[in-house]
Amino acid sequence: MPVRACLKTSALLTVIATMLTLASYSLTADAATRASQFKLANGLDIIVVPDRRAPVVTHMIWYRAGAADEPPGYSGIAHFLEHLMFKSTEKIAVGEFSKIISRLGGNDNAFTGHDVTAYFQRIAKDRLETVMGMEADRMVNLRLDIKEVLTERDVILEERRSRVENNPSAILDEQINAALYLSHPYGQPVIGWEHEIAKLSRENAFDFYKRFYAPNNAILVVTGDVEPEDVRALAEKTYGKIPSNADVMARPRQQEPAHRAPRRVDLKDPRAGKPSWHRSYIAPSYMTAKPGESEALDLLMKVVATGSTSRIYRKVVAEDKLASSAGGWYSGAARDSGKIALYAVPADNVTFVQIEAAIDAVLADIRANGITQAELDRAKKAYLAEYVYDSDNQASLARRYGWSLTVGRTVEDIEQWPDRIAKVTLEDMKAAAAKHLDIRSSVTGTLTPAKPDGAAPPSAPNRT
């Protein structure tokens, strides 16, 4: 079985900017508007994006369920169920799902986020019906042997120990995120807290499965060498046989109160290789922002913190030599709130106080004076180039549509994004900076390679 992982934010690509000019930001219809959409009688939403250059397809099924939908005290159950979905059904023996895909010449995997869980296969087009039948089968016919459940729970506990408990940077990231959200479940880790993972049961997994896994709570995305009507016919033949589930529940969530004071998290750990400085701000997501606001934040963080031409990098790395690296990003692909993140790795003999003061000075200048037209133009070119690049990749297209639709956006929202980016003004950028680079809505964290004050050095817990 392939390694399953909680989804992490990946670095944005910066490529083929020369393909675009400042004179025109519009994309062709072929790059920006290619999706067909329809819905089956049982409520399954289907998106098809043809790409006929090679006889292969990417098939993804997305569920409107993630770590933020878990009941209190059961963190990690969404990710746990993702693992268990690769066990067995009435038709497929334990551990055979991925082996069958491999024998068919394809590959598969899955991931869990706070708002989504997704399963995908890349396969030859003439195997699509087989894959759709397999995925439809495990949507309703999952079988869980208690021994397999307990074994997989141990696998996840070990995954957490190796990826989090033995990684000081991951510990700090988790602690910052928990401090950032005063009430909202985005503050709990997707993989779950260790003490809660250890108590997850077969019954807990089935409860989550029965609550969220149904055609009327799912989105099917198929990209590649296919015709929309052919996909519709195959979907009717496979997924269409599954009845909708009237018991699929809404997704009530704790709402975040107003943030009135900044918070700090300072972690000392002798296992840390180098000191590092971090800050996260709560921000609106593309779902909750006012029109144009998230687009402005995307562009703002491109100017402020992305790459060697960014304001923060130029100031703290290139000019003042205070850091060996620095950067940041805006993450707005969420159902509820988004996040702005910054980081810096201090140079030798540079203190966190110096780093923080320098970065705060850059942010204060941006808030007060905004950015230049040249900076805005470069940011637009870079983002639109990335959009074109991603549009040339089946898997990227499937993720673009699947993720956005699963958190509540529309095909129109997705395909008109380049036009909205092109319309962002300098005034929009300045307003976004003034509103959302608010220290009261932030958590600042530091990681120091040293023994914690008044405590023994941390060590990974013994495996039980």
Set out the residue ranges of the language-model regions.
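Charge-rich, well-structured scaffold segments of protease-associated domains
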Residues: 2, 34, 39, 96-249, ...
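N-terminal secretory signal peptides that target proteins for export/translocation
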Residues: 1-8
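Short acidic-hydrophobic surface loop/beta-edge motif
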Residues: 36-41, 265-268
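His/Glu-based metal-binding/catalytic segments typifying zinc-dependent metallopeptidases
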Residues: 161, 178, 247-309
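Boundary at the C-terminal end of the N-terminal hydrophobic targeting segment
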Residues: 26-33
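Peptidyl-prolyl cis-trans isomerase
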Residues: 50-53, 463
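Bacterial N-terminal signal peptides
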Residues: 10-25
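Active/ligand-binding-proximal structured segments within catalytic/core domains
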Residues: 43, 53-101, 279, 291-304, ...
